[in-house]
C-alpha cells in the first residue's frame, strides 16, 4: 500500500517524520476489548485496503460525526419501516433474525448526556446536520456520542472552553514600539 500525504498535515508530518494516510470515509464501527474502532476507506486506495483503526489514532472527527449521524438517521428509518421488513424476512433463518434484534437493542440505549456519564473532552465538531454538534468523549467509557453544542455549552462549559482553547492559534505582529527600536539601531 503506497502512502499519501495530506497537505494540511505537512507540518505535523515533518515533526513526526511519518506520513499520514487520508481517510475518505468511515464505513463501520465496532468495540474490541473495550476499545472503539472504525472501519476506514482510504483516499486513493481500493476497498481491499480498508482497515479497522482504533479511535484514539484517528484525526477525522468530521467524518466520524458524519458516520454517527448517518447511523442515527438509518436507525430512525429502520424503525418506521420495521413492520414491513419483518413480514418479508419469514424465509430467513433464525440466526440472521437475531442480528437485527441485537443491533436494535444496542441503538436504543441512551446516547449523549442521557447516559448520565461525565464529559471528558470534545474530540471534534461538525455542523453536517445543520446544527453544531460536538463529538463528546466520556470519562470511564471508550464510546463517544454526538451532542448538540447548545446542550454542551450549558452542561459542561469548561469542556467546551478547553476544546476551543486547544485550537486557538495566536499570530504576533510587530508593534509600533518594535519598529522604533529597529530605527534607532
Swiss-Prot record:
Positions of the record's site feature: Interacts with the PxVxL motif of TRIM28/TIF1B: 16, 125-126, 135, 146, 167-168, 170
> Domain named Chromo: which ranges?
21-79, 117-175
Effect noted on mutating residue 161 to E = Abolishes homodimer formation and binding to EMSY
Known PROSITE patterns for this protein? CHROMO_1, CHROMO_2
Q: What is this protein's record name?
A: Chromobox protein homolog 1
Q: Which residues form a coiled coil?
A: none
Q: Does the keyword Ubl conjugation apply?
A: yes
InterPro entries assigned to the protein according to its UniProt record, in alphabetical order: Chromo-like_dom_sf (IPR016197), Chromo/chromo_shadow_dom (IPR000953), Chromo_dom_subgr (IPR017984), Chromo_domain (IPR023780), Chromo_shadow_dom (IPR008251), Chromodomain_CS (IPR023779), Heterochromatin_chromo-domain (IPR051219)
Q: Where is the composition biased (Basic and acidic residues)?
A: 73-89, 96-121
Q: What organism does the record attribute this protein to?
A: Homo sapiens
Assembly behavior: Homodimer. Interacts directly with CHAF1A, EMSY, LBR, TIF1/TIF1A and TRIM28/TIF1B PXVXL motif via the chromoshadow domain. Interacts directly with histone H3 methylated at 'Lys-9' via the chromo domain. Interacts with SUV39H1 and SETDB1, KMT5B and KMT5C. Interacts with PRDM6. Interacts with POGZ. Interacts with CHAMP1. Interacts with INCENP. Interacts with SGO1; the CBX1 homodimer binds to one molecule of SGO1. Interacts with LRIF1 (via PxVxL motif). Interacts with HDGFL2. Interacts with CHD3. Interacts with CHD4.
Amino acid at each position: 500500500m503506497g502512502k499519501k500525504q495530506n497537505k494540511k498535515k505537512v507540518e505535523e508530518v515533518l515533526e513526526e517524520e511519518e506520513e499520514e494516510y487520508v481517510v475518505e470515509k468511515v464505513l463501520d464501527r465496532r468495540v474490541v476489548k473495550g476499545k472503539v474502532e472504525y472501519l476506514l476507506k482510504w483516499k486513493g486506495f481500493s476497498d481491499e485496503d480498508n482497515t479497522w483503526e482504533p479511535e484514539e489514532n484517528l484525526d477525522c472527527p468530521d467524518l466520524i460525526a458524519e458516520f454517527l449521524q448517518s447511523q442515527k438517521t438509518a436507525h430512525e428509518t429502520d424503525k418506521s419501516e420495521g413492520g414491513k421488513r419483518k413480514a418479508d424476512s419469514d424465509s430467513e433463518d433464525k440466526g440472521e433474525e437475531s442480528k437485527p434484534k441485537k443491533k436494535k437493542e444496542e441503538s436504543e440505549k441512551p446516547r449523549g448526556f442521557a447516559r448520565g456519564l461525565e464529559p471528558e473532552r470534545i474530540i471534534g465538531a461538525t455542523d453536517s446536520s445543520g446544527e453544531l454538534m460536538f463529538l463528546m468523549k466520556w470519562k470511564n467509557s471508550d464510546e463517544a456520542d454526538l451532542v448538540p453544542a447548545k446542550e454542551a455549552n450549558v452542561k459542561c462549559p469548561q469542556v467546551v472552553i478547553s476544546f476551543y482553547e486547544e485550537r486557538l492559534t495566536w499570530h504576533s505582529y510587530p508593534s509600533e514600539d518594535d519598529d522604533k527600536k529597529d530605527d534607532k539601531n
